[in-house]
């Protein structure tokens, strides 16, 4: 009996010794709550460097006083917060003071986190300590000039501006409004970007109830982005949709907000999103706020300046393929500019920033595919100013003009880098207005952009010339027109004879357009030829023109039709339709062309040949895929391009009655459809 009693005593002692260890282990439910609190606070966005380990810090944060680097908040005991007690963590979060007694810069939104409840703070601490992987990564020192590198001064800043009180619900407001106020003012720290700052970098108000509450969320410029006023935002449903998906019927997020949506708000519960939106809607508009639209923009007639101003022509060349001539954008893909608050904002910082450096959509569960707008820094300051001034004054936008000096100032601050080393010189459609025959060449350009609309009797399907000759024939490797007229008359193997430029154009009408030829001497044909001649410049018949045609792919690559179908579904269907029918808007206007069916090109078209189509696809499709100027075009591998081209070129399409007359002297390509 002695030994069992001894064993029992030993077990009891071991249990007692182990109790402190288990007492420090948070229950899974608390860690899960803490993970959600971390999402509410968007901790990962600031505490994760680009391509860095989550929560390990190192992200560069620019301030008017210098550069700060976010800290490592993983539970690593040497370089992170692994040795913090809860009390030390709580003090840091509420007062901005580290365990060593050092004040942190208020770029960390501890004045907002001070409003957190103790329950949320304890849950967050449990998650960071037990739900995040420890990473050994030393913190980087801030690069601050005098006197801002004297951290003792931050204690005075705290004395003047810090309110350490936790959020107290307003008894006069319901539970939804109070929850929204708690999230916006506290964990969400929305005011860090959206509230104007004072001379000491303090937020002018920490809530709408402050003495200066009219400033709360009234808009601020942060790191060259304009954080718009959030007061009296759209309807609750519209705001919920934006926070959940990154876009709604009025706007699409950009800049740092895309990361906020991706890492943070898309993960909020619908109840919390509704609470946030309800609170924002309850705030009266600021004195300088533009009125928030209540009705989404409907397609409208293009502005009269579209084709008779430099800004309008620049817009048509570089912007309209995604944002459309009416500024309506493409739903779910590219944002509308008509009625877009960032476009017409009194402070155009975001618009300038996006134009110079580019933009990406937020990656969300609703919109998992990221679309990219390349930067347009290669355009001159005056060109950008003209285009943006046109955008800000069109489609009922009421923004003030942009000057070249404003563009230059932003360019100098951002120092955007262009990496495209192509020798191709992109023609500028704005220069059409300086031509002696300006009216004729502008008409010729429009016939390429609006072929179906302007020549309905000659176009037998839904295509326009620009469907294949991108941006009206001005994109390298997008079948551009630069120098082309210098090579006509020229021998055409398919015709077996020398053809004129007019005959070549009519070949497109009969094949790609599945339509009827234009009379060679007609006004419209001569306008099209004049447009080609305008792009001829000094090209001679013996010259090689950089970027001409669509390039080539190796015809030894064997297509895999099964993979082609998969590539089409993943990369192409969103613009060209699940069944190749193209993409149309609600009013029936074609946005992107059909790739097969009765409204597509016939079997006599060059694009009906698999390897020709593959070369085009490789260099030009999809658009919005990455940062390549000017459409973010191309990006598939050679094999993927061949596979998907073989897949869609073999789909049903109209016949070409004169196909038997092609290649009369032999040499028919192996991928001809007949």
Give short role names for the model-derived ranges:
Residues 1-30, 68-71, 92-100, 119-174, ...:
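Post-cleavage N-terminal segment of exported redox proteins
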Residues 28-49, 53-62, 156-159, 168-198, ...:
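Sequence/structural segment immediately N-terminal to covalent heme-attachment motifs in c-type
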Residues 32-33, 40, 48, 53-80, ...:
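Sequence context of c-type cytochrome heme-c attachment sites
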Residues 38, 84, 89, 127, ...:
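Conserved hydrophobic/aromatic "anchor" residues
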Residues 48-49, 54-59, 102-104, 135-142, ...:
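Short, solvent-exposed loop/turn and secondary-structure capping segments
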Residues 62-68, 143-165, 170-171, 181, ...:
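Primarily the internal scaffold of c-type cytochrome electron-transfer domains
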């Amino acid at each position: 009996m002695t030994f069992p009693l001894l064993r029992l005593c030993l077990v009891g002692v071991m249990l007692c010794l182990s109790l402190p260890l288990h007492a420090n282990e948070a229950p899974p439910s608390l860690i899960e709550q803490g993970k959600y609190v971390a999402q509410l606070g968007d901790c990962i966005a600031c505490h994760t460097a680009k391509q860095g380990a989550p929560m390990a810090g190192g992200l560069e944060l620019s301030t008017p006083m210098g550069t700060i680097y976010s800290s490592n908040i993983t539970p690593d005991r040497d370089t992170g917060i692994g040795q913090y007690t809860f009390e030390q963590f709580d003090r840091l979060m509420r007062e901005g003071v580290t365990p060593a007694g050092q004040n942190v810069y208020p770029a960390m939104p501890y004045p907002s986190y001070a409003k957190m409840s103790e329950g949320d703070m304890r849950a967050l601490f449990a998650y960071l300590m037990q739900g995040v992987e420890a990473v050994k990564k030393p913190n980087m020192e801030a690069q601050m000039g005098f006197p801002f590198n004297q951290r003792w001064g931050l204690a005075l800043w705290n004395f003047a501006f810090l309110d350490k009180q936790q959020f107290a619900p307003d008894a006069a407001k319901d539970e939804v409004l109070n929850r929204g106020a708690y999230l916006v003012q506290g964990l969400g720290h929305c005011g860090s970007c959206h509230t104007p700052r004072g001379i000491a970098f303090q937020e002018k108000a920490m809530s709408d109830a402050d003495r200066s509450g009219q400033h709360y969320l009234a808009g601020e410029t942060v790191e060259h982005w304009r954080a718009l006023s959030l007061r009296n935002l759209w309807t609750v449903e519209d705001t919920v949709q934006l926070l959940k998906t990154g876009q709604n019927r009025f706007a699409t997020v950009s800049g740092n907000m895309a990361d906020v949506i991706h890492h943070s708000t898309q993960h909020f519960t619908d109840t919390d999103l509704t609470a946030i939106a309800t609170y924002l809607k309850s705030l009266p508009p600021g004195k300088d706020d533009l009125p928030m639209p209540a009705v989404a923009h409907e397609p409208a007639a293009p502005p009269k300046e579209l084709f008779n101003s430099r800004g309008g022509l620049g817009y048509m060349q570089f912007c309209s393929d995604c944002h459309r001539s009416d500024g309506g954008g493409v739903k779910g893909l590219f944002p509308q500019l008509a009625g877009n608050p960032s476009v017409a904002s009194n402070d155009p910082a975001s618009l300038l920033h996006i134009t110079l450096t580019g933009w990406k959509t937020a990656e969300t569960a609703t919109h998992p595919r990221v679309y990219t707008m390349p930067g347009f820094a290669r355009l001159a300051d005056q060109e950008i100013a003209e285009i943006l001034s046109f955008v800000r004054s069109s489609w009922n936008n009421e923004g003030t003009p942009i000057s070249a000096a404003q563009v230059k100032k932003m360019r100098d601050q951002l120092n955007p880098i262009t990496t495209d080393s192509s020798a191709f010189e992109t023609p500028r459609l704005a220069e059409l207005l300086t031509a002696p025959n300006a009216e004729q060449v502008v008409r010729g350009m429009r016939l390429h952009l609006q072929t179906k609309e302007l020549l309905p009797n000659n176009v037998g399907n839904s295509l326009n010339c620009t469907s294949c000759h991108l941006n009206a024939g001005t994109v390298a490797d997008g079948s551009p027109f630069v120098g082309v007229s210098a090579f006509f008359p020229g021998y055409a193997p398919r015709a077996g004879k020398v053809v004129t430029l007019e005959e070549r154009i009519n070949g497109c009408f009969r094949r790609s357009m599945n339509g009827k030829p234009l009379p060679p001497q007609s006004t419209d044909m001569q306008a099209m030829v004049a447009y080609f001649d305008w792009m001829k410049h000094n090209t001679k018949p013996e010259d090689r023109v950089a970027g001409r045609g669509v390039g080539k792919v190796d015809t030894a690559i064997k297509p895999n039709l099964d993979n082609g179908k998969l590539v089409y579904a993943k990369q192409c269907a969103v613009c060209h339709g699940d069944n190749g029918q193209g993409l149309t808007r609600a009013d029936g206007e074609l946005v992107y062309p059909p790739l097969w069916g009765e409204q597509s090109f016939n079997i006599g078209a060059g694009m009906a040949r698999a390897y020709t189509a593959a070369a085009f696809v490789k260099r030009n499709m999809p658009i919005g895929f990455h940062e390549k100027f000017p459409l973010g075009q191309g990006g598939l591998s050679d094999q993927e391009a061949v596979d998907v081209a073989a897949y869609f070129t073999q789909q049903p399409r109209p016949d070409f009655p004169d196909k038997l007359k092609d290649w009369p002297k032999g040499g028919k390509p192996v991928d001809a459809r007949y």
